[in-house]
């Protein structure tokens, strides 16, 4: 199945969701509303029922709100639900994006540079979150340059350099691949502590 040329809403309904390298939150909406936007993709309510505030729509809206709060709790932002998303620090905005992506109930979650701009503590928290996502049975596809994070969370790794695949395999194979070492690591690195 190809998703090329499909609209974002259609892709999400197919079970594919993503976050962006550059944070894309709705800054003037609350943290909760940002996640609810992601959940609305799975909504059955149409424009007319939403506009008329019909009973079924109100029930669905309540379910969407509850689901959004569960996703905020999953990423550790439940206490920030009423704050404006634009007021969150970068690390929390990235977590918010993950919560919004998870609200679509994806089978596949694409994370584009999720550790970009994060400090060590935030990156460790992100790794723990990704492990919890994987435990939920969601496939995570990661585009990332933080090799410690990649080695920590990955079962399989494909390495590209200037658009060309240079290696593919298990983390242990990748960390010892001479092309990967030359392109990204600069020297052999001991990841055995991870």
Say what each PLM segment does:
Residues 1-194:
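Glycine-rich phosphate-binding loops of nucleotide-dependent enzymes
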